[in-house]
């Protein structure tokens, strides 16, 4: 490991592994509003497990989408681990869909809110929101 004016520079592999080590920070309530014109169209909300992670430095200060997907998988996986017992096989990823609605800023942490949509006998479903600046 070497150092720079701003602090230690990690080996790229060490840095990637460090980025994937998310910090659990508790839970939050996520609400979903319907269209503004439709009165009473509030879609309700759900509770979510919340994790925080940082980004690898990237050109132009943007977050690499693959990093966000990997962090989302880690966050979702941490909400499934507690379901497995000694008799049950570990749950593996079967399907992943990602939508990038806004660019991310690599200089700010990302908050991952994981909604537990379903926990059945054979599979679980999760929705992960990657949030910066409240959006």
Region spans (language model):
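Terminal targeting signals and extreme-terminal segments of soluble enzymes
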Residues: 1-135
